[in-house]
């Protein structure tokens, strides 16, 4: 996609929630803004809600027509010009100074504490997540009732070479399966699973 952009004024935004910075660092491959749902793998225990915006600090925001919030005076902050004051870190400082103030999306202190505690073990947890995914995916692909398993760790998967290129280790811990029994069969599997929980979260201490 970056090759198709063709404009230096296009911001490259990446959601790195599923890989995390433990195995993939988009800023090293041209991303300008990286976002995370910290509720998932970063906190790692399904007990803290939050989100994160990371500014790679490489994008030139000095374009009045496109980014006037960053280049023109902000009257709510005594006329500060964010780009003039912070340079290429204008966007992240604007997010902190204005967006948080206006929208109120501030993480609670206890959620922040739980998230930071979880991040301390991120590297080890991601390795275990991926080794578990490897075993389960390889078990399922051989099952006579499974039609297909889509996981970047399989050499025949269309994302295999990309995962090898961009991931420091492993192939991620999330995959999808298609069962031969179709929708009704898949529904029956979900309803009768005991070890795996049918929940909206990922990256938990539980198998989801």
Please name every model-derived segment.
Residues 3, 16-17, 41:
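Generic detector of well-ordered alpha-helical packing
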Residues 33-174, 178-190, 195-205:
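Active-site C-terminal subdomain of aminotransferase-like
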Residues 12-13, 34:
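Hydrophobic beta-strand scaffold residues
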Residues 17-19, 154:
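Active-site beta-loop-alpha junctions enriched in small/polar residues
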Residues 7-8, 19-25:
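Active-site core of PLP-dependent enzymes with the aminotransferase class I/II
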Residues 1-6, 11:
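Single conserved hydrophobic/aromatic residue that forms the stacking wall/gate
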Residues 208:
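Glycine-rich phosphate/pyrophosphate-binding loop
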């Amino acid at each position: 996609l970056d090759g198709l952009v063709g404009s230096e004024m296009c911001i490259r935004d990446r959601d790195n929630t599923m890989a995390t910075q433990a195995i993939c660092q988009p800023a090293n491959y041209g991303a300008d803004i990286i976002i995370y749902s910290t509720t998932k793998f970063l906190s790692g225990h399904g007990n803290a809600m939050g989100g994160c915006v990371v500014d790679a600090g490489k994008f030139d925001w000095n374009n009045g027509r496109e980014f006037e919030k960053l280049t023109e005076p902000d009257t709510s902050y005594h006329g500060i010009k964010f780009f003039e004051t912070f340079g290429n870190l204008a966007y992240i400082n604007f997010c902190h100074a204005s967006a948080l103030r206006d929208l109120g999306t501030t993480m609670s202190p206890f959620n922040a504490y739980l998230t930071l505690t979880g991040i301390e073990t991120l590297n080890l947890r991601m390795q275990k997540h991926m080794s578990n995914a490897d075993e389960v995916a390889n078990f399922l692909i051989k099952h006579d009732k499974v039609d297909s398993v889509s996981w970047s760790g399989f050499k025949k998967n269309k994302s295999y070479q990309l995962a090898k290129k961009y991931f420091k280790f492993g192939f991620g811990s999330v995959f999808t399966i298609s069962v031969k029994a179709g929708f009704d069969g898949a529904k029956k599997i979900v309803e009768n699973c005991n070890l795996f929980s049918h929940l909206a979260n990922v990256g938990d201490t539980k198998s989801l």
